């Protein structure tokens, strides 16, 4: 696996025996007001041994309102995202992916990746 760093370079995520890597997505950015950001990543096997990549996506129930957690915003740190249901969020990502042929990202995440080059 590789992740794209803030300079726009792909860096390896070396496998560590007995562990696994968890990628967080856009919902963590919304919940934490960008305290925890998703990383652009890709799965590559550059090793001579087999490597297993098992994507597993978890979303809240569709009617659940996704919004910044109370502990992640305040008077000098307003929420960066408008509240929306989980279904609205996922639908917007799927629609964007269909329009562009690229993975769906929130607008803020897409701009961050674009700025990195």
PLM segments and residue spans:
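C-terminal flanking tails of non-heme Fe-dependent oxygenases
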Residues: 1-117
